[in-house]
């Protein structure tokens, strides 16, 4: 500070004398900055200065305790002692000659070149010794054998076996290695290119070391040569991208050999200096074949490959051991996950990660399809590359390159450039491919082309072109197949797959098993191809090579055994599939009968037509492929929206478990796409579609979708006229509304949902009642299919509803869950009280049509699926219902023992998948295929407004015109993501508070029975809704959009007047949440 001020003072005279003030200003600025820096320095010095104690200890400051004179004396003594010590050292220092001899001083009279040579020799000797030690250090395999490296026992056994096979010959010979490596020089581009990249290090040496050392080498090489040829044979293919299919065939052996090439090349670079030193050292008498040319220019693109000196065999052996060691570790890890992966399609990411780690370089090159082949070793493929390669470390990039048989030398940008093509392929193909392989549902998703569930098959065909075909083709055309698959997949919507993936991964392994069964049922060929098949293919293709490769042989028995197991599993799955198909046929027959009955009843021809199409679709759904055809049905076709299907495909993965379970009837979803009724019919497909952003008619999700999801039967017993109860059964294949025969006919239209065939339900004890109702229903169902689907609006007449609601008031108190255990029959028996689900109907007498809200709780799947349908013919259905009577909605938990048994059977048979949750979109979230059947709020028509019945899942039955329009718009918005995600969507709430929570759909696992208390609260619908949420059970709430219903507090959503209907598709917001529900009041519903 002082100095700077002094400087300033000194500077002033100059500046002032010059009379130039500009420099003065500049100088002031400079000085100011100097002062600042000086301040900082001073601050630092002050902070870092030694304490007085330290200064005292170092003799710099006198201690406070002792007098200053004493301190000075001590200091002088110290100095004297130091001086004496230095003088002594100077006297005893060695002579110059001695220093020269010790190379501390240079000889003035000697030639400088000689000295330099001596120094070089000395350094070279040191380097050579070090190199020798390094070259002869034990490799990881040897360390493992000697128990120096701790490894998993299985890996150790494999390593010991492999090590004995591959490396016995080279392990003992270290002398010739150096020579051969020395002999090799960048001058040998031709030989090295072939060898360096593809050949194992040992071979080049064999051919290129015609040195005296070969005396010992020949024998060694003779023994080594057998392995070398094998390595050389496969590695070239592995290394070269074109033959990648072959490379994939190479199992770990190939990989190891192939990798060694690039790896060796890369590592040889660092070693070059050492090699040079060795040659200079001339410690060996052998003649040098070639001297390294230091001036030779090696272009960067060739550096890692052609003109690099080959690694000495010792180093190569080390590298190979390391690679083998890593591969064996990966293999052991893969084996641990082997079964899980093949069966579990869900965890794509894990698989990919493993793949990326796996040492199958060639396989990776193969393409997403080969990945599966790749998995020959395990069930893995070179994992898909992350979106940004820059984030990867160099070591990770090199690992990826090795997996793909690419050179690993070069800078990070070079590595990234090499990996980019694979990144693109993987991003599109692998995501799709992985999905496809992963699960039929995923495949379905990927297959937008097949609008229906067919996608699975189609995808499958593209991917594997049939199980058998894949097997046959894979070895030769595995790559092409893979490529095709990639192409097919890449266009496919990948986004759904991630959600599916996540949902699947979250599921239990059991779920995965059931899922695989489902997939198999859906299309055995596809399932096979999806995982086991590919494995089989890979292993088959590998087998030829593996026979040649010694390393492969180690795993051959294991692989064979696994393959056999997989084949057995496939056979079992096929048998199950056949059984399921037979069952489907029977159900289809039943459906046919029902359909005919329904057709006969021409209640409102149009509605019936939709219902019919739905039914046919359902049947076809069971068929799977036929579904698509069914979709072609006039109604279906018109209603069918390819987009919905496509979205369904996407969404389907979620439901796939359920849908496929639905008995391959999942495809039914498609059938339900018929436009008018299609909306409802689109059921699952539309449901999913809508979730995917398609605005299927108002149907957000269809009961069927739920049904597909759950084999659980939704029994929405709607008591029509109080006497008849409509039970909606969402059997595996379809959702069915069953109305008691009594009011069945009139109510049936409402129940039109009958369109859903209770395939599973029929099969189960429910079946008997269903048939009766179905016959009556079918007509109505057909006529009303949309309505029914929408809301199973039983008791369409608002008048009826009001009284109904009044009745239910007490009923509501009953746990809306009449214990799922109560059979559907039970619910039928107590139709009037069944209003239990109808929340506080009594409170809402004023609002004539609080639609009855039927909540069917499907405990089966943890996630309830909510579906909203706009029944185009809703008004007609309402009319019918009104004419019929005011049916009392009865919410039955079709959760009787029969149902439990049925679910168990279905799950075992794979018809129903355990909770498979997919969140392709908020809607799909709402109705995670978790086989929870959305409660179809059997909101009977809200008589005043055109029945605004909303399926508990956001099913809103609004006046057809306004509702459908608003529903579509809102659906679009919802699909587009304007709606909060399913988890965020609050139960539909009507600000008029005149809505009743229709019901919760709970996972069968969480029986709503436990929540019967919530039903008791039904008097205050809002409470009910919240309690349900609190229970954490997915709640399907039906919004009856009658603002007339003042009592429905639970619906916070402001509903326009009854006439406007539920324009806000708040109902659309999936009512079903797999788990946490936000406080309804906190959830913003973006429906306008």
From Swiss-Prot:
Subcellular location: Nucleus
Annotated SAP domain residues: 389-423
Chief location of this protein within or outside the cell: nucleus
Record organism: Homo sapiens
Protein name as catalogued: Myocardin-related transcription factor B
Cross-link Glycyl lysine isopeptide (Lys-Gly) (interchain with G-Cter in SUMO1) per UniProt, renumbered positions: 628
Note on domains (UniProt): The N-terminal region is required for nuclear localization and the C-terminal region mediates transcriptional activity.
Cross-referenced SUPFAM superfamilies: SAP domain
Subunit and interaction comment: Interacts with MRTFA and SRF.
Residues modified to Phosphothreonine: 367, 370
Post-translational modification: O-glycosylated.
Region Required for interaction with itself and with MRTFA, annotated ranges: 563-591
Function: Acts as a transcriptional coactivator of serum response factor (SRF). Required for skeletal myogenic differentiation.
Site note Breakpoint for translocation to form ZFTA-MRTFB fusion protein, residues: 394
Residue positions where Phosphoserine is found in the record: 66, 541, 543, 921
Coiled coil region boundaries: 545-601
Keyword set, alphabetical order: Activator, Chromosomal rearrangement, Coiled coil, Developmental protein, Differentiation, Glycoprotein, Isopeptide bond, Myogenesis, Nucleus, Phosphoprotein, Repeat, Transcription, Transcription regulation, Ubl conjugation
Pro residues: bias regions: 238-248
Location of the region described as Disordered in the Swiss-Prot/TrEMBL record: 165-310, 349-389, 472-508, 528-553, 595-655, 829-886
RPEL repeats: 40-65, 84-109, 128-153
GO CC list: glutamatergic synapse; nucleus; postsynapse; presynapse
